[in-house]
């Protein structure tokens, strides 16, 4: 990678670390793909079939239900024109900047940053970055919570199995629900105490 220079090396490293941190999210949707045939990478109109604007979004996609990815596909481009469907969306890279949905917008897109957005009212399971999968078998799951507006809930059903054998074919797996409801008094967490986890709240927009 040094052949391409230090900047390219750092950008690739950052992208790989992002992938590793999202493994619990990716693995959950990989199981859904196995069970239901739904792809992890989804055209926008698959999640938003009644929004005609999504029919023209051929350079962005949903990654599961919660994340919207808009990769730069034009040489030397420094910005990205993209469409956000209904709802509110946070810039997943800074976890702070909030955008209203049902609009086209242009965002900065340096080589070091893939434009990514998470829908308000989502929960993203993540894990610490490792050198390889299985380096730390007893890793903590970190739930990133992007709370819904008052009166609504954010939820996720995390899927886990050993990942090293076919035990899942014999129902040797765990599905763990997490729900965070936004109330007038604050956030109410519903989570079964089946393992130690970390909850990280991102409160922009509520």
What are the residue ranges of the model-derived segments?
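Catalytic core of carbohydrate-active enzymes
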Residues: 1-198, 202-203
């Amino acid at each position: 990678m040094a052949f391409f220079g230090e900047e390219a090396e750092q950008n690739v490293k950052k992208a790989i670390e992002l992938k590793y941190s999202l493994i619990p999210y990716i693995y959950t949707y990989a199981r859904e793909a196995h069970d239901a045939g739904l792809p992890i990478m989804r055209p926008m109109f698959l999640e938003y079939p009644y929004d005609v604007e999504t029919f023209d979004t051929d350079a962005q996609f949903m990654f599961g239900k919660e994340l919207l990815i808009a990769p730069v596909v034009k040489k030397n481009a420094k910005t990205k024109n993209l469409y956000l469907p209904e709802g509110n969306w946070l810039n997943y890279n800074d976890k702070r900047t909030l955008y209203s949905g049902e609009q086209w917008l242009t965002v900065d897109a340096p080589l070091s940053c893939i434009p990514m957005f998470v829908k308000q009212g989502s929960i993203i399971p993540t894990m610490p970055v490792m050198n390889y999968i299985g380096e730390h078998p007893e890793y903590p799951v970190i739930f990133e919570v992007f709370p819904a507006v008052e009166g609504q809930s954010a939820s996720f059903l995390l899927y886990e199995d050993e990942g090293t054998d076919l035990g899942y074919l014999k129902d040797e797996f765990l599905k763990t629900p997490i729900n965070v409801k936004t109330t007038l008094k604050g956030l109410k967490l519903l989570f079964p105490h089946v393992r130690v986890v970390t909850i990280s709240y991102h409160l922009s927009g509520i």
